[in-house]
């Protein structure tokens, strides 16, 4: 929930940069998972949830304008 509150404070440009960062992080976690080196598998779910939250906020900010 804390991340969602922080995401809501950001403008669209910051949300896009956050989305790119999260997508890169998701890619890196997937590569670690495939190679068997992922020590914290719960991070995949957390990053995926954050990506969904950012995309939802971006869509809602687009509808407002």
Swiss-Prot record:
CDD domains reported for this sequence: Ribosomal_L29_HIP
Pfam families xref list: Ribosomal_L29 (PF00831)
Keywords: Ribonucleoprotein, Ribosomal protein
One GO location term (cellular component): ribosome
Domain of life where this protein originates: Bacteria
PROSITE patterns associated with the record: RIBOSOMAL_L29
Gene Ontology BP, a term: translation
Keyword field contains ATP-binding: no
InterPro entries for the chain: Ribosomal_uL29, Ribosomal_uL29_CS, Ribosomal_uL29_sf
GO molecular function, one term: structural constituent of ribosome
Segments forming a coiled coil: none
UniProt keyword annotation of Ribonucleoprotein present: yes
Family per similarity comment: Belongs to the universal ribosomal protein uL29 family.
Stated name of the protein: Large ribosomal subunit protein uL29
Species of origin: Buchnera aphidicola subsp. Acyrthosiphon pisum (strain APS)
């Amino acid at each position: 929930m804390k991340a969602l509150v922080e995401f809501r404070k950001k403008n669209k440009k910051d949300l896009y940069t956050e989305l790119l960062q999260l997508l890169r992080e998701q890619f890196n976690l997937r590569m670690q998972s495939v190679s068997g080196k992922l020590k914290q598998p719960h991070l995949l779910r957390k990053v995926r949830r954050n990506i969904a939250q950012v995309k939802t906020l971006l869509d809602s900010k687009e509808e407002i304008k």
